[in-house]
UniProtKB/Swiss-Prot annotation:
HAMAP family: HisA (MF_01014). It is found in: Cytoplasm. It catalyses: 1-(5-phospho-beta-D-ribosyl)-5-[(5-phospho-beta-D-ribosylamino)methylideneamino]imidazole-4-carboxamide = 5-[(5-phospho-1-deoxy-D-ribulos-1-ylimino)methylamino]-1-(5-phospho-beta-D-ribosyl)imidazole-4-carboxamide. This is 1-(5-phosphoribosyl)-5-[(5-phosphoribosylamino)methylideneamino] imidazole-4-carboxamide isomerase. Its EC number is 5.3.1.16. It comes from Cytophaga hutchinsonii (strain ATCC 33406 / DSM 1761 / CIP 103989 / NBRC 15051 / NCIMB 9469 / D465). The gene is hisA. One of its GO terms (molecular function) is 1-(5-phosphoribosyl)-5-[(5-phosphoribosylamino)methylideneamino]imidazole-4-carboxamide isomerase activity.
Length: 240
């Protein structure tokens, strides 16, 4: 059964969503992320994708207190991302209670660093953030596009045991038009050793059911939940 992973994106300590990664298209949903996390846990959900959007912009961890407060108040298994660049950033995140971290831009800019993290912290703790824009990897909160394809990116980390990857199609994110099913099908067939987590575009329950039928490991649900298109009860049925 597919893993349901709700997303909480943080700016100024508050729960927000961006459209297509654009900081100018920001909508605030809740002033207290801990309450949102508790709501997920109360519904039977076990995981959380927590993104420090301030950190992604500043290229260093910013909202670690929110992470700390969520892991203190819930038993959710949290993966944390956004601007993680250094060993010290990872230490802060893990000390604050993160079960996993997502390495995004740093995997493109400094692959040796992420290879080192896989060796040092173990493959269960590191998720590769593969954000694609027209087939190429987007970095720094999707403000820039690199000259790497997703296949080239993955091949840099497979020898180091990478097991988890969140793949976001930036063109789909926040638009509620459905995920990039063809992309996930291709990646799932091409890289069978990777637990793929689909992100971006989920608009209704049928999208999650289709990803589940395709054998995708996990799905991140954001705007569809916050806009009331998918209920907590519907999400929780996958964890039954």
């Amino acid at each position: 059964m597919i893993q349901i992973i709700p997303a909480i994106d943080i700016i100024d300590g508050k729960c927000v969503r961006l459209t297509q990664g654009d900081y100018n298209q920001k909508k605030e949903y809740h002033s207290n992320p801990v309450e949102v996390a508790k709501m997920f846990e109360d519904a039977g959900i076990q995981r959380l994708h927590l993104v420090d959007l301030d950190g992604a912009k500043k290229k260093q961890i910013v909202n670690y207190k929110v992470l700390e407060n969520i892991t203190a108040a819930t038993k959710l298994s949290v993966d944390f991302g956004g601007g993680l660049q250094s060993d010290e950033d990872l230490k802060i995140a893990f000390d604050a209670g993160a079960r996993q971290i997502t390495a995004g831009s740093i995997a493109v800019k400094n692959p040796e660093k992420v290879q080192h993290w896989l060796t040092q912290f173990g493959k269960e703790c590191i998720i590769l953030g593969a954000d694609t824009k027209s087939g190429m990897i987007a970095v720094h909160g999707w403000q820039e596009t690199s000259d790497l394809s997703i296949q080239q990116l993955m091949n840099q980390f497979i020898p180091f045991g990478i097991s988890y990857s969140i793949c976001t199609d930036v063109a789909k994110d926040g638009l509620l038009q459905g995920p990039s099913f063809d992309l996930y099908k291709q990646l799932n067939e091409e890289f069978k050793q990777i637990n793929w987590i689909a992100s971006g575009g989920v608009a209704e329950l049928a999208d999650i059911e289709k990803l589940n039928d395709m054998g995708i490991y996990g799905v991140i649900v954001g705007k569809a939940f916050y806009e009331g298109r998918i209920t907590l009860q519907q999400l929780a049925q996958f964890n039954a």
